[in-house]
Design a protein with these regions (language model features):
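Short, glycine/charge-rich flexible loops or terminal/linker lids adjacent to PRPP-binding catalytic cores
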Residues: 121-166
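PRPP-dependent phosphoribosyltransferase catalytic core
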Residues: 184-217
Length: 217
C-alpha cells in the first residue's frame, strides 16, 4: 500500500507534465468520497492547427451541396477528426459545469457524443419524429431559419433532468432555426443553455441565431 505522500507527489508530477504538454489538467477532490479527476484540454496553438487542417480538407468545391449545405459525412466518420473536435469544444466548456450535451439527429450525434465523453456527462438526441421506444416526449414547434417553415422537434421526458445546464452541439449551421428550437426545448425542461457550438456554418450573413461559436467559418 503506497504512502499518501508518495501518491501526492506522483499526482503532482503527472499534473505538471499534462499541463506542460497540453494533454489536460488533473483535479483533486478532497474527502472520503473524493479522488482524482482528469480533464482533457488542448492548447490554443494545437486547436488552431487542428482547425486549419480541417479547413484545408473542407476547401473543396465538390463539398458544396444543393440548398447551401456542405458534405461533412466523410470527415465526421474519422476518429481523429472527432477527437480534435471533441477536445476543442470540451476544453472551452470544461469549467462551465455542463450537465448534458444536446444535439439533433443525425449528423451532429458523433460530435456531441465525443464532447460528452470528454466532459463525462450524458448526451441527449433531439428528434424531429419521436420513436415509440422513447416513451412520453416533450415537443415544440420552431421556425426553420432557412425555409421559414414551421417544424417540430421532440425529446423524451426521461432524457433531460430539470435544472440541467446544457451545451448544444451540432455539425452545421445554415440559418440558425435548429439551434433556436433546441434552446426553446431546453426551456421546456426548466433548464438553461450554457452555450451553442457548431462544426461549421454557411456563408449566409443573416443568421437568425446569436451567441454561438463555430469551429470553421
Amino acid at each position: 500500500q503506497s504512502a499518501k505522500s508518495s501518491i501526492s507527489e506522483d499526482i503532482a508530477i503527472i499534473k505538471k507534465t499534462f499541463e506542460k504538454q497540453g494533454v489536460g489538467i488533473i483535479r483533486t477532490v478532497p474527502g472520503a468520497a473524493g479522488g482524482v479527476i482528469f480533464v482533457p484540454k488542448i492548447k490554443r496553438e494545437q486547436a488552431l492547427a487542428a482547425a486549419e487542417k480541417l479547413k484545408e480538407q473542407m476547401n473543396d468545391a465538390s463539398r458544396l451541396l444543393p440548398g447551401g449545405y456542405i458534405y461533412l459525412s466523410d470527415l465526421l466518420a474519422k476518429p481523429d477528426v472527432l477527437h480534435d473536435l471533441g477536445k476543442m469544444i470540451a476544453s472551452a466548456y470544461e469549467d462551465k459545469k455542463i450537465d448534458a450535451v444536446m444535439t439533433v439527429a443525425t449528423k451532429g450525434v458523433p460530435i456531441a457524443q465525443t464532447v460528452a465523453n470528454y466532459l463525462n456527462v450524458p448526451f441527449v438526441i433531439v428528434r424531429r419524429d419521436s420513436k415509440i421506444t422513447e416513451g412520453s416526449t416533450v415537443s415544440i414547434n420552431y421556425v426553420s431559419g432557412s425555409s421559414s417553415r414551421v417544424e417540430k422537434m421532440e425529446l423524451s421526458k426521461r432524457t433531460l433532468a430539470s435544472g440541467s445546464n446544457v451545451l448544444i452541439v451540432d455539425d452545421f449551421l445554415k440559418a440558425g432555426g435548429t439551434i433556436n428550437g433546441m434552446r426553446s426545448l431546453i426551456q421546456e425542461f426548466d433548464s438553461t443553455t450554457a452555450g451553442a457550438v457548431v462544426f461549421c456554418e454557411s456563408g449566409v450573413s443573416n443568421h437568425n441565431v446569436t451567441d454561438y461559436s463555430s469551429i470553421i467559418k
